[in-house]
Amino acid sequence: MCRLLGVSRSAYYDYEQRRCNCPDDLHHRQLLNAVQNIAKSCDYTYGSRRMKRALNALDYRVSRWKARRLMQEAGIQVKHRKKYKVTTDSNHPLPVFENQLNRQFTVARPDQVYVCDITCIWTQEGWLYLAVVIDLFSRKVVGWSMSSRMKTTLVCDALRMAIWLRRPPPGLIVHSDRGSQYASKAYRNLLKAYGFIGSMSRLGNCWDNAVAESFFGSLKQERCQWRHYQTRHAAQQDILQYIAVFYNNQRLHSYLDYKSPNQYEAEAAKSIKAA
């Protein structure tokens, strides 16, 4: 047969091997379709580890190796991270809080420790500044605020949103870097009014606020660096969609055993109620 076809025996066997490795069956086509849908829903940001977990959640029992092969077969390329400028201004004469957190990033319950930070996103109109408040328990973004200026009201509004949504009790630790906005009198008074405990990273040590830094890395890697925002309003709408729809509700978080923050909190609430 090989002589009739005009091909070598090794070429024929190589073709047969490739054909066997790519089965044209219903289950395989369903798997590929699921991979493509997951990749699209996460804006092509999931690597093979998260893809495996997402497929497992849909009752497809695949390994990470299998997930990688399916992604390759589907032609899916994952977006990669860039570096970004630091926005913290720690060079100020304002008083700072002691570091109460000390890199203890694991907590037992919601609304026990919040971490806060500011970043900037470029638009054709200029910089847009984003302040967030994250609950350490579930890594959920519980408060945020955006503005064209990096002023004290930016961080106060983000914390007020978290207070309004979550009603955290007195004694909550609120950690941030040493930026002047977090050291301001208005912000300190806000903490005092609700009986919260202020905490700040050590000077020049970004790892003390690693959870907030990690969120900003995900936001920019998975969304902002692939966009060309014409206006601040367009950026605000896109960031809002990322936080409220994708990150809190859908994105699989490795720290949460590949659950979304909302799913993790819901399961924790059920466990507490059943206890």
Segments from the language model and where they lie:
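Charged DNA-binding/catalytic regions of mobile-element recombinases
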Residues: M1-A275
